[in-house]
UniProtKB/Swiss-Prot annotation:
Residues annotated as domain Fibrinogen C-terminal: 539-780
PROSITE patterns, per database record: FIBRINOGEN_C_1, FIBRINOGEN_C_2
PTM-bearing positions, type Phosphoserine: 279, 326, 470, 526
Record has NADP as a keyword: no
Modifications the protein undergoes after translation, according to the UniProt entry: Conversion of fibrinogen to fibrin is triggered by thrombin, which cleaves fibrinopeptides A and B from alpha and beta chains, and thus exposes the N-terminal polymerization sites responsible for the formation of the soft clot. The soft clot is converted into the hard clot by factor XIIIA which catalyzes the epsilon-(gamma-glutamyl)lysine cross-linking between gamma chains (stronger) and between alpha chains (weaker) of different monomers.
NAD in keyword set: no
Native species: Rattus norvegicus
Protein name: Fibrinogen alpha chain
Length: 782
């Protein structure tokens, strides 16, 4: 029985296994045979349960591998990854666009703000330059006034000292006369003199005089601030990138930067021979490898040349002068006042701008007028003062002056046949063309005095103030009194002359109505107004200065050093000079200069008479102004200033009251009242050699071809250079230029003698100075 049970169990198990292998169980279950009630079913996240997929062979790839479930999973995973990356890129792009827009807006605002700052900075720079220049000018004026007042105080101190000495001398004289009266005077007059009081006052006064009221030497030159834009602030490569960049960045190309430099007028940064980069063009021995710079042949970038009588920057418009009339016509020239041979009319003493009224009047027959003018032809460039007939090859300014004259002959008959004949002839001294459009002016007649015109025309009273001066001469066109007008350059010619004759038994009246515009040589405009029978002409003209002090007071650019045109009283010639307005009171006219030995000063009498050499507009060069000019410039007395500088940079000066005689007097030298630090070489001379043999005062001028010295031989021939020799010299600024300073006279040929550029009291006779200058200015009070 037990074995049967075991066999049944084995059969049951075998059937169960067989059912599972053949799928009958599944069918059975599907048929509902395994239903045992509700059961919990777990949802699988994916039907792809297998993760370990076998490798696919080539033949199994299409129909068996890979699994679709596996492919779907890989595709979904890659799609999700790409989607995340794209979203991240989109978010980054949106952020960058927003930031870019914000940065562009901020950049634009910043550049606009900076553009305004740049404009304000440029305005501030310009304002600062103007204010500093105005301040410097005011300080210069104040300094000049202080120096002038200090000199006046010194003069007053000397006057007080002289008066004190005179009072003391007078006291002594009175005491002597009282003591000499032995009669009743000795019994009735009791007088005591206290000389100690005078001595005490004199000592106190000497202490006051000993105080130096003038500014120190180191404060003599007032520095100037020079502002100039910096070129190429942005390099070229960056500038091209800015041009191609956004519009807001182009504001950087408009940015300007100013360079500010502090300059000292009259002083160079390296003005000594032992300093590198010497800019003054000195001789070859001043430094190794240096080269003499000849001012007659300037190098690249040097200044041009300017001949005397020319007109350029820094000078007024010059005009030809010297009109000539008939025997009964008043004659006058520019810048002077002299009576005519007939009526004695005078030119206005101050020929500034003014207003003139012309009234009709009776005319006399056979009235002749002659006008003269000068025509300038100027080319651009720098200017240089050229003295004498020195030939200069340069690309600078060249000026040609053409002198032209216009003669008008006018004839008016009486009532028995009215006839008016006007003949005009224009001639030139050198045969040059004066131009068809040139108008030499008109002749204006005046009734009454010019000071009455300001009362007649109060609305035009500004023309009669102190700026333009008062014109007090009387002018009449017809009759025995006539005068000539200024010289004008016609710019417009709408004039109409309408003669009107009135019937009369004795006289003929001519009325003119003229409307004409003129322009002067310095481009000053003037107008002519027509009012019935009265013609009023407002004129302008350039006032010609007579010296550098006049230039300092009246010229718009007179406070700066430079070349100016002047015209001496009593002379019709206009010539150019160099004015030094920085030294002392200013107004110094340079008459001689030595600075590099480039010019030979051993010249003839005629050379020294006319002058020779050249200067550029910076005052560099060697020259002699001319003895004729020295005589005319010092007629009324002048102050001579001699400035000396040795090769070590030591400076000294000497000042004298100065006058040069005429050629008939041998250009005799008259000096007095020495002041300075160089020593008195012109009056006292050399003490060792003897004052009577070496003093230059009252000596005539001598050259190698005209001996006027006190020596038995010719000093000018032995020592070289024209000078006021005695027997022979204690000073000779026109001697031989020896580079280096000290020289051995034994090496000189043909004469073994001290013939350098010397001032014996300063550095001795065997020392040739590096730079010397002679300047003159009018005496104070003239």
């Amino acid at each position: 029985m037990l074995s049967l049970r075991v066999a049944c169990l084995i059969l049951s198990l075998a059937s169960t296994v067989w059912t599972a292998d053949t799928g009958t169980t599944s069918e059975f279950i599907e048929a509902g045979g395994d239903i045992r009630g509700p059961r919990i079913v777990e949802r699988q996240p994916s039907q792809c349960k297998e993760t370990d997929w076998p490798f696919c062979s080539d033949e199994d790839w299409n129909h068996k591998c890979p699994s679709g479930c596996r492919m779907k999973g890989l595709i979904d995973e890659a799609n999700q990854d790409f989607t995340n990356r794209i979203n991240k890129l989109k978010n980054s792009l949106f952020d960058f666009q927003k930031n870019n827009k914000d940065s562009n807006s901020l950049t634009r605002n910043i550049m606009e703000y900076l553009r305004g700052d740049f404009a304000n900075a440029n305005n501030f720079d310009n304002t600062f330059g103007q204010v500093s220049e105005d301040l410097r000018r005011r300080i210069q004026i104040l300094k000049r006034k202080v120096i002038e007042k200090a000199q006046q105080i010194q003069v007053l101190q000397k006057d007080v000292r002289d008066q004190l000495i005179d009072m003391k001398r007078l006291e002594v004289d009175i005491d002597i006369k009282i003591r000499s009266c032995k009669g009743s005077c000795s019994r009735s007059v009791s007088r005591e003199i206290n000389l100690k009081d005078y001595e005490g006052q004199q000592k106190q006064l000497e202490q006051v005089i000993a105080k130096d009221l003038l500014p120190a030497k180191d404060r003599q030159y007032l520095p100037a601030i020079k502002m100039s834009p910096v070129p190429d602030l942005v390099p070229g490569s960056f500038k091209s990138q800015l041009q191609e960049g956004p519009p807001e960045w182009k504001a950087l190309t408009e940015m300007r930067q100013m360079r500010m430099e502090l300059e000292r007028p009259g002083k160079d940064g390296a003005s000594r021979g032992d300093l590198p980069g010497d800019s003054r063009g000195d001789s070859a021995t001043r430094g190794p490898g240096s080269k003499i710079e000849n001012p007659m042949t300037p190098g690249h970038g040097g200044s041009g040349y300017w001949r005397p009588g020319s007109s350029g920057s820094g000078s007024d418009g010059n005009w030809g002068s010297g009109t000539t009339g008939s025997d009964d016509t008043g004659t006058w020239g520019a810048g002077s006042s002299r009576p005519s041979s007939g009526s004695g009319n005078l030119k206005p003493s101050n020929p500034d701008w003014g207003e003139f009224s012309e009234f009709g009047g009776s005319s006399s027959p056979a009235t002749r007028k002659e006008y003269h003018t000068g025509k300038l032809v100027t080319s651009k460039g720098d200017k240089e003062l050229l003295i004498g007939n020195e030939k200069v090859t340069s690309t600078g300014t060249s000026t040609t002056r053409r002198s032209c004259s216009k003669t008008i002959t006018k004839t008016v008959l009486g009532n028995d046949g009215h006839r008016e004949v006007v003949k005009e002839v224009v001639t030139s001294d050198d045969g040059s063309d004066c131009g068809d459009g040139m108008d030499l002016g008109l002749t204006h007649s005046f009734s009454g005095r010019l000071d009455e015109l300001s009362r007649m025309h109060p609305e035009l009273g500004s023309f009669y103030d102190s700026r333009f001066g008062s014109l007090t001469s009387n002018f009449k066109e017809f009759g025995s009194k006539t005068s000539d007008s200024d010289i004008f350059t016609d710019i417009e010619n709408p004039s109409s002359h309408v003669p009107e004759f009135s019937s009369s038994s004795k006289t003929s009246t001519v009325r003119k109505q003229v409307t004409k515009s003129y322009k002067m040589a310095d481009e000053a405009a003037s107008e002519a107004h027509q009012e019935g029978d009265t013609r009023t002409t407002k004129r302008g003209r350039a006032r010609t200065m007579r010296d550098c002090d006049d230039v300092l007071q009246t010229h718009p650019s007179g406070a700066q050093n430079g070349i100016f045109s002047i015209k001496l009283p009593g002379s019709s010639k206009i010539f150019s000079v160099y004015c030094d307005q920085e030294t002392s009171l200013g107004g110094w006219l340079l008459i001689q200069q030595r600075m590099d030995g480039s010019l030979n000063f051993n010249r003839t009498w005629q050379d020294y008479k006319r002058g020779f050499g050249s200067l550029n507009d910076k005052g560099e060069g060697e020259f002699w102004l001319g003895n004729d000019y020295l005589h005319l410039l010092t007629l009324r007395g002048s102050v001579l200033r001699v400035e000396l500088e040795d090769w070590a940079g030591k400076e000294a000066y000497a000042e004298y009251h100065f006058r040069v005689g005429s050629e008939a007097e041998g250009y005799a030298l008259q000096v007095s009242s020495y002041q300075g630090t160089a020593g008195d070489a012109l009056m006292e001379g050399s003490v060792e050699e003897g004052t009577e043999y070496t003093s230059h005062s009252n000596m005539q001028f001598s050259t190698f071809d005209r001996d006027a010295d006190q020596w038995e031989e010719n000093c000018a021939e032995v020592y070289g250079g024209g000078w006021w020799y005695n027997s022979c010299q204690a000073a000779n600024l026109n001697g031989i230029y020896y580079p280096g300073g000290t020289y051995d006279p034994r090496n000189n040929s043909p004469y073994e003698i001290e013939n350098g550029v010397l001032w014996v009291p300063f550095r001795g006779a065997d020392y040739s100075l590096w730079a010397v200058r002679m300047k003159i200015r009018p005496l104070v009070g003239q």
